[in-house]
Structures are given as structure tokens and as C-alpha cells.
Amino acid sequence: MKSKTMPFDAIENYIKKVHETFSTFNPFYIISGDTDLENQSSINHYRKASHLLRNLAPDCLQSYHIRGRMVELPKEIIDEIDFYMYQTGHSAKESDKEMCYQMPEYFFTNYPVKPLINSEPCYELIGYAGNMYGRFHQFDIRRAAWQSLLAGASAGITYGAGGVYSWHEYGKHFSPCIGEGFDMPHPWQIALHYPGAWDYS
């Protein structure tokens, strides 16, 4: 795990605070964010958070938000989550354009059947990942939505707008090192009005 990781012994107090603040609203708890579960230390951190929340809020559903285009999940996590979340992400490479239907197929073929969500198809007008020139437009995100749903994202899809996810503001710096090397987003005030949002509503 990278530096600035929450110490293992701080997880319990943090989770108690999360539970006290949110569990009364019956949320879905997303245990991780864009994680690749690359080593046992990472897995242990997230599993501890998951177990604590499961004991404190047994009626709240749980899942993990794994990094883009990742399909490999540790068995111990598969057995503990209530539904799968995958993200096809923001790559415009030809080899990645099939992810919207290949990833659900992988989940159905290799894991016990559970509800499935594409939690991060390409965001509208986000710059292509990998410092590639171009942006995803209304047609692209609509295609990603339909491919995901028809391929098995039975619990749904999410919509994202480049500029809203980062609350980008006029005149603010945006580092291409953030995420996968995305281009400067539009300010959130503009991104709120992207037309593709209506295709998802």
C-alpha cells in the first residue's frame, strides 16, 4: 500500500464514526475506492473495515469499488460482499472498448452469481485515460450504458460527468497525474448540463 495509508489500528474508531453517522440511513457501504487489492496488507485493511461494518450494520449492503478494468477478486472478499461492482473505466484504446460486455461475462463465468453494477463506465466529456487526446461524448456513454446492461449489469450502471466528479472550478489547476492521466475537465458548472445525463435518467 502507498504512503498515507490509514494505520490498521485506526480503522476501528473510523468505522465506528462512519456507522454512527450514516447507518441510520441504510446506505450501501462501498468499502474501497479504486483499489487494486494488490497485496495482503491492502486486503486485510479493507476486510477489517468490512467486518466491523457488517457487525455494526448487518442490514446495510456492502461491495468494493475496484480499479478500472480489473476482474480478479480475492476469494475471501467474493464470499463477503453482497453485490459486485466493476468499472470499465475511461480508456479509449481499441483493446478496452469491449470491456463493457467482457467484464460482466467474466464475473458470471468465474464467480458465484450476485447482482452486478458497472460502477464507472466512461464519464461524459472526461479526457481519455493514458494521456490520449480526446473525450467521451454522449454517444460513447450511451453505448457503454447499453452494452453494460445487455451484458449483465443487472443491478445497474452509474453516470459520471467530467468536471463534476472532481468539482473542478474555473481557473483551477488540474494535474494530468491524477487518475490515469486525464485532460483538464470542464468546470462543474458546465458539466452539470451535459446532455448525456438525460440518457441515463
Predicted regions located by residue number:
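Solvent-exposed polar/charged
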Residues: 20, 55, 109-110, 150
